[in-house]
């Protein structure tokens, strides 16, 4: 078993997950880089982690797994433990957008099932598997304040978009999952926090960049810029460093002030 803290990040081949992995590598953690299918992108994340790492003893392993599949979730945990012998933190980041942005009067059940399987069912039951491991093995945590679970949700958890209802519902459910696991695991030395990003510059939003450029310029985001993977990575880094020792089940907004009610 490694003596360094180990972070498992889902959906880490690109976007927000890559930002989280690279920041954690710079912090001195070893990392399991989960990806669904893009092996080359995952290898690039691993290379970036190695470049950022301050210690040659840190390890970085890419593990293919579709978290929407039960057997893949077990494989992901098994492979992480085989590589490192322990898990100290889990960042539930992996998620998908609907293939088609359809009005909720026309959206398909197939899209609903696909989005919720990956965005909600997957992280909920992956958390269950990791939590069971901690409760069974009872090894001491190496991170300040104990073990950590971070749910990366979205402003869509509380903001209605009628052309992607499945996505909004998945993120709203994930926000509740964070609270549920926080309540269940607090006494076990596990801190659970939700990060709620706003409009982020990633592959997922590339197709609507012009639309959101205009909205941001018009003041939709008070800080008047896009969020970045680095913004999310820095927030996770603070959590891993124990910056919020008396918090669990809380929401940390990373949205440039989008959530502020304004006149």
Where are these regions (language model features)?
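Short C-terminal tail/terminal secondary-structure segment
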Residues: 97, 101, 219, 237, ...
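Substrate-binding pocket helix/loop in short-chain dehydrogenase/reductase
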Residues: 101-104, 108-116, 217
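Alpha-helical segment proximal to the catalytic Tyr-Lys
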Residues: 132, 182-184, 245
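Short, small/polar-rich loop/turn modules that mediate ligand/substrate recognition or access, typified
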Residues: 186, 191, 247-249
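Active-site helix of classical SDR
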Residues: 127, 170, 178
């Amino acid at each position: 078993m490694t003596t360094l803290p180990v972070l498992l990040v889902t959906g880490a081949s690109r976007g927000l997950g890559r930002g989280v992995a690279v920041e954690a590598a710079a912090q001195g953690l070893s990392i399991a880089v989960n990806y669904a299918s893009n092996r080359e992108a995952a290898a690039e994340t691993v290379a970036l982690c190695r470049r950022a790492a301050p210690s040659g003893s840190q390890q970085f392993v890419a593990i293919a797994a579709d978290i929407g599949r039960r057997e893949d979730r077990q494989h992901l945990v098994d492979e992480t433990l085989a590589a490192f012998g322990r898990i100290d933190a889990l960042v539930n980041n992996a998620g998908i957008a609907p293939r088609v942005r359809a009005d909720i009067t026309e959206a398909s059940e197939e899209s609903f099932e696909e989005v919720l399987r990956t965005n909600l069912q997957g992280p909920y039951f992956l958390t269950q598997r990791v939590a069971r491991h901690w409760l069974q093995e009872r090894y001491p945590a190496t991170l300040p304040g104990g073990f950590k679970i971070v749910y990366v949700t979205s402003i869509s958890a509380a903001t209605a978009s009628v052309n992607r209802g499945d996505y909004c519902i998945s993120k709203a459910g994930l926000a509740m999952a964070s609270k549920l696991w926080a309540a269940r695991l607090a006494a076990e030395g596990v801190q659970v926090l939700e990060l709620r990003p706003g409009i982020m510059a990633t592959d997922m939003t590339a197709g609507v960049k012009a639309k959101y450029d205009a909205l941001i310029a018009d003041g939709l985001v008070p800080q008047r810029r896009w969020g970045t993977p680095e913004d999310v990575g820095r927030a996770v880094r603070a959590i891993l460093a124990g910056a919020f020792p008396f918090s669990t089940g809380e929401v940390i907004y990373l949205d440039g002030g989008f959530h502020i009610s304004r006149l």
